[in-house]
């Protein structure tokens, strides 16, 4: 599906091909990432310095960078003092200088670089630029132009219509099957994936007995303005859980800041997820769970590497605690998406915030029961879990008590 690595023998063939997509709940966001691109003025300035020192200011790449930097600097940004926002359009010559820079990049990559440090940086800067140029060739109605940073702005062509692209990219195939444990609720997910009303939707029952997972909800106000005061109750709930039933637990937080705030007050031995963890560090982090016997308590970030894709069957994991409802951080990108979904689907908050949040919650809770014989607990700490709007986003087999 990625236009940069399009598999022509599949998508351009006339023969029968059926596409199977696992973990399809990630697809809308992945498509948006693939179709979006950016021009980073600050990054270009740093790289231009390296290129200038190594190859001289007369080098074609240096000149092409200067043209793009000048074009970004000449953009008419709002005079309200804001540090980010959207632009209705870009000047006519903006695309031309960006294409010229991409050509200069490609020519430079064919050279035997006299500068070692620039090699990797060229690739890091080139790929978003190529994506930006591809984005600008598509229908402008499918994109929003965003700017970030007033002094040296970053300009992003942000893809909005992932459903339309997915539908167009797969229309020549004989069939597409999307599946995931978190494609719920199906009507909303079908819209996000560009499905038609007559497309078949199936919700399979959980293969695991629902009584094997005890889910309890506690009313805690975890909204940003109340997080400091919420820490006291969160610490109390975690302590009560691991004291009442010692074992191996994962606790998930909506952000690293909230995680650290709670860790400072939690008087229990525990591991804390770090922002940057290589494969060896991740494996070491999970060793406490994969060893026979003993207890383990770890504080992690919801939606991170430890809330999806890890398998801890049997007594390797006794339960999880989820703090908050997983709403994405409010930022320029999410607010632009919210406005887009409000226009196209009628409920921007549901599609931009609630659905992605509850998908992360469902994935985290799904770490507990991995086989037919597993048993465990999940503790949901947020008052919004009792709201009907959030209840309908929970898997049908969940039995939540208070």
Where are these regions (language model features)?
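N-terminal targeting/trafficking signals and adjacent low-complexity tails
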Residues: 349, 379-402
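Switch/connector loops and helix/strand junctions flanking conserved nucleotide-binding motifs
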Residues: 27-30, 185-192, 259-261, 307-311, ...
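Short His-Asn-centered micro-motif
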Residues: 1, 21, 158, 179-181, ...
């Amino acid at each position: 599906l990625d236009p940069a690595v399009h598999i022509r023998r599949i998508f351009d063939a006339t023969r029968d091909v059926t596409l199977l997509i696992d973990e399809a709940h990630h697809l809308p966001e992945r498509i948006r990432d693939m179709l979006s691109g950016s021009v980073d003025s600050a990054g270009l300035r740093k790289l231009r310095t390296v290129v200038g020192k190594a190859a001289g200011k007369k080098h074609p790449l240096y000149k092409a960078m200067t043209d793009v930097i000048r074009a970004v600097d000449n953009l008419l940004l709002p005079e309200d003092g804001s540090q980010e926002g959207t632009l209705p359009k870009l000047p006519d010559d903006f695309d031309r200088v960006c294409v010229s820079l991409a050509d200069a990049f490609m020519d430079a990559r064919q050279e035997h670089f006299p500068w070692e440090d620039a090699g990797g940086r060229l690739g890091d800067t080139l790929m978003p630029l190529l994506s930006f140029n591809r984005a600008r060739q598509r229908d402008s109605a499918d994109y929003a132009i965003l700017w970030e940073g007033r002094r040296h702005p970053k300009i992003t062509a942000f893809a909005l219509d992932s459903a339309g692209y997915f539908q167009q990219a797969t229309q020549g195939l004989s069939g597409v099957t999307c599946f995931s444990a978190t494609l719920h609720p199906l009507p909303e997910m079908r819209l996000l994936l560009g499905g038609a009303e007559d497309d078949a939707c199936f919700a399979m029952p959980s293969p695991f007995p629902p009584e094997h997972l005890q889910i309890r909800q506690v009313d805690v106000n975890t909204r940003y303005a109340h997080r400091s005061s919420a820490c006291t109750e969160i610490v109390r709930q975690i302590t009560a859980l691991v004291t009442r039933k010692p074992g191996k637990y994962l606790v998930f937080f909506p952000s690293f800041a909230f995680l650290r705030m709670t860790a400072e007050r939690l008087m229990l031995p525990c591991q804390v997820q770090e922002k940057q963890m290589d494969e060896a560090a991740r494996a070491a982090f999970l060793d406490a769970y994969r060893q026979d016997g003993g207890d383990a308590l770890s504080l992690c970030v919801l939606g991170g590497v430890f809330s999806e894709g890890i398998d801890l069957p049997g007594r390797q994991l006794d339960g999880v605690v989820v703090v908050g409802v997983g709403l994405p951080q409010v930022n320029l990108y999410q607010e632009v998406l919210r406005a887009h979904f409000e226009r196209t689907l009628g409920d921007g908050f549901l599609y931009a915030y609630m659905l992605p949040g509850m998908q992360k919650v469902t994935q985290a809770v799904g770490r507990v029961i991995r086989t037919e014989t597993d048993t465990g607990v999940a503790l949901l700490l947020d008052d919004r879990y009792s709201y009907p709007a959030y209840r309908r986003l929970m898997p049908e087999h969940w039995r939540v008590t208070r």
